[in-house]
Amino acid sequence: MSSPGISDESIKGPKDVRLIHLILSSLGVPSYSQTVPLQLLTFAHRYTQQLIQDSQVYAEHSRGQNAPISVEDVRLAVASQINHSFTGPPPKEFLLELAMERNRKPLPQIQPSYGFRLPPEKYCLTQPNWIVSNETQQNQPKEENSSDSRMEEDKLDFSVKSE
């Protein structure tokens, strides 16, 4: 993190990076990541490049091919960038008007029941739809020492409920 009170000699790097550090410290920014000056330089480079390209287009349109860029071309490019890229928030009155229009429509009434409405239970898939019955246990008395316990398990009847 960088701190305020940075002198020009204490910052290592290109002149532009030192300039960004000095601007941030003069604005009273107490601390920032070391990537912030690089991001600001990238933004400034892209913005300047776009202004020069737009100025060149305006110069070629007004004075022909390979015309030099004039101050008026740069001013026009800056004005178009400000109108296009840097838009402010809408006016407060406009937002209040939109809010009043939206709030005119009443909210739906709250139903006496809460949650999701489910269909009747017989149509819901939340209930089991099968019955397990063991015919051998119902018809015969239990044997305590049965060696064929697996055979009895195989006789379980899985039938589907019919309603």
UniProtKB/Swiss-Prot annotation:
Polar residues composition bias: residue spans: 131-140
Q: What is this protein called?
A: SAGA complex/transcription factor TFIID complex subunit Taf9
- GO MF annotations, alphabetized: protein heterodimerization activity; RNA polymerase II general transcription initiation factor activity; transcription coactivator activity
Cell compartments where the protein resides: Nucleus
Q: Where is this region: Disordered?
A: 131-163
Q: Which family does it belong to?
A: Belongs to the TAF9 family.
Q: Say if the entry is tagged with keyword Nucleus.
A: yes
> Which Pfam families does this entry report, sorted A to Z?
TFIID-31kDa
State the source organism's domain of life.
Eukaryota
| Modified residue annotations for Phosphoserine | S159
**Record InterPro entries:** Histone-fold, TFIID-31, TFIID_subunit_9
> Keywords assigned by UniProt?
Nucleus, Phosphoprotein, Transcription, Transcription regulation
Q: What does this protein do?
A: Functions as a component of both the DNA-binding general transcription initiation factor complex TFIID and the transcription coactivator SAGA complex. Binding of TFIID to a promoter (with or without TATA element) is the initial step in pre-initiation complex (PIC) formation.
> The organism's lineage?
Eukaryota, Fungi, Dikarya, Ascomycota, Taphrinomycotina
Q: Please list the coiled coil stretches.
A: none
Which gene underlies this protein?
taf9
Comp. bias (Basic and acidic residues): 141-163
Q: Which GO terms describe its biological process?
A: RNA polymerase II preinitiation complex assembly; transcription initiation at RNA polymerase II promoter; transcription initiation-coupled chromatin remodeling
Q: What does the subunit section of this Swiss-Prot or TrEMBL entry state?
A: Component of the 1.8 MDa SAGA (Spt-Ada-Gcn5 acetyltransferase) complex, which is composed of 19 subunits tra1, spt7, taf5, ngg1/ada3, sgf73, spt20, spt8, taf12, taf6, hfi1/ada1, ubp8, gcn5, ada2, spt3, sgf29, taf10, taf9, sgf11 and sus1.
Listed under GO cellular component are: cytosol; nucleus; SAGA complex; transcription factor TFIID complex
